[in-house]
Regions:
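Structured, active/binding-site neighborhoods that engage oxygen-rich ligands
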Residues: 1-336
């Protein structure tokens, strides 16, 4: 694989997480009609949180949230240790949540909050994630895709391991494995249909892992969402149908199908995808991060407008380019 191209795709994936997260930050967890009231022109650039936002009050334009922070924790784990272990994930998440006081308030999602508190109290991590079915696993999973270009079996195995402490349900693993499989395929492929096929492979394989839990089928909801985006309806009608019928909430079986649908709707153009996520309503920052991770891996960092990466770095100092370089080094070394 061309080293420069691999770098561009990995960088694009991480940039998609951060830019999607930051663009959806001001509208995060707001209903669609409330977003239209607060932002009558729509959100088509990085904006500050509206005053009094229930989670992001006072945050500035371009600022990222937990989605990007947790993604980089998983990237750190892989870059430091060369593998993903459930213990390593739990250790990283607990240290981070303690550092930023996330065990108080709404910053930490419901599955992670519940499970990490139990783990801190000494619970067995093979038990703590058995009812975790929300989208936190999918929002932070992209490093698993980045670690295994083209190797979907390894993606599914590592996804189940990463989900174990907090999201050890078939539903959460299916969503996360779908996203990570899309990314792992996009690193080595410029055909969107193949990446979508990989997503469905990951969803189906993920459903065989973890504890059994009930929820709407991610596979069937995604198929329905894809029919919707190919129906010829107007952009606004498709957004409203995704919001009302597929859903854009914190459930994995809402957020992940809608994210994949947005990627297909805009043929993998990451800026259009994350703009749609910021305006669609519901869990906008997380849908932006998930859809952005897939579109960014598909299109590469070159697929974003030029101002995006400098703005994200100026506000957040994440060093995403360095992260991408370190991934490439690790993957090229492992290949030799
Ligand atoms: Mg967030």
């Amino acid at each position: 694989m061309m080293r420069q191209k691999l770098f561009d795709k990995i960088y694009g994936c991480l940039l998609g997480v951060a830019a999607g997260d930051a663009m959806g930050m001001p509208s995060s967890l707001l209903p669609a009609d409330e977003i239209q009231r607060l932002f009558p022109e729509g959100i088509d650039s990085f904006l500050p949180a509206p005053p009094g936002h229930m989670i992001h009050d006072q945050m500035v334009a371009g600022e990222i949230t937990d989605d990007t922070q947790q993604t980089l924790l998983l990237a750190d784990l892989f870059l430091e240790t060369g593998s993903f272990t459930a213990e390593g994930v739990a250790r990283k998440l607990i240290a981070w949540a303690d550092r930023i006081n996330a065990f108080d308030g709404l910053y930490l999602g419901p599955s992670s909050m519940r499970a990490l508190k139990l783990i801190k109290d000494g619970a067995d991590i093979s038990k703590t994630g058995l009812i975790g079915d929300t989208n936190g696993a999918s929002m932070r999973i992209s490093p698993v895709g980045l670690a295994h270009p083209g190797d979907l079996e390894a993606v599914v195995t590592d996804t189940a391991e990463v989900c174990k402490p907090t999201h050890n349900t078939n539903i959460a693993i299916a969503g996360a494995a779908g996203v990570a499989s899309f990314i792992a395929t996009a690193l080595a492929c410029d055909n969107l249909e193949e990446c979508v096929d990989a997503y469905f492979y990951g969803v189906k394989a993920g459903m065989q892992r973890g504890g059994k839990w009930t929820g709407a089928s991610i596979q069937h909801r995604t198929e329905w969402a894809l029919k919707l985006v190919r129906s010829g309806k107007t952009e606004k009608d498709i957004w409203s149908n995704l919001y009302n019928y597929i859903g854009t909430g914190v459930a994995t079986s809402e957020a992940v199908p809608t994210s994949l649908a947005l990627v297909v709707m805009y043929a993998g153009d990451p800026w259009q995808v994350i703009r749609a996520a910021a305006n669609i309503g519901g869990d906008c920052d997380t849908i932006g991060a998930i859809a952005g991770s897939m579109a960014g891996a598909f299109a590469g960092a070159d697929g974003f407008p030029e101002h995006v990466a400098p703005k994200i770095e100026e506000v957040n100092h994440l060093g995403l380019e360095q992260y991408a370089n370190r991934f490439v080094e690790k993957l090229v070394l492992a290949d030799d």
